[in-house]
């Protein structure tokens, strides 16, 4: 699932614990990281190692966590956001298809988690939603996804679909896998990695 996740740090004061050991462990004014947001899972669209954890390669973008967490801080116009989304993606981010694709439509793809982070960097305040999930009689599942980007001068949205077969043994969760595809295609409709579909 590819939705924005935010993290914040908050200070909590704790009333007097009953034991000295508890006072040491839970000292007042200790900073505790609090995660809030939507659970994101990466179903496994590209191969049989969906259960393996993979390291995320270093990249040349950093997602600001606290600065842009509220939608009131958006000051960039849509034209600037779209210009930045159309920039070339660093080569260490672009992945090749594990089983090489039979169609020459795409030379590579951006994993959903990198697309998520890049959207959070270039278009803070973006919003994504699953509009429809369609189960076909032939064993396919299709997800319709809408991506909305907000700027200082308005908002724009793009919709796209992702389809996978439910009989593929390499895919643990077909709905999540279809959502990942639909999300990345919606990002491409805004220009993020669009050139990968033309090479």
Swiss-Prot record:
Biological processes, Gene Ontology terms: double-strand break repair via homologous recombination
Key words of the record: Acetylation, Chloroplast, DNA damage, DNA recombination, DNA repair, DNA-binding, Plastid, Transit peptide
A GO-annotated cellular component: plastid
Record keyword DNA repair present: yes
Tissue specificity of this protein: Expressed in roots and shoots. Expressed at low levels in cauline leaves, flower buds, flowers and siliques.
Transit peptide interval: 1-40
Phenotype upon gene inactivation: Reduced fertility, increased sensitivity to mitomycin C, and decreased levels of intrachromosomal recombination.
Family: Belongs to the RAD52 family.
PANTHER family the UniProt entry points to: DNA REPAIR RAD52-LIKE PROTEIN 2, CHLOROPLASTIC
Function: Involved in double-stranded DNA break repair.
Name this protein carries in UniProt: DNA repair RAD52-like protein 2, chloroplastic
Gene source species: Arabidopsis thaliana
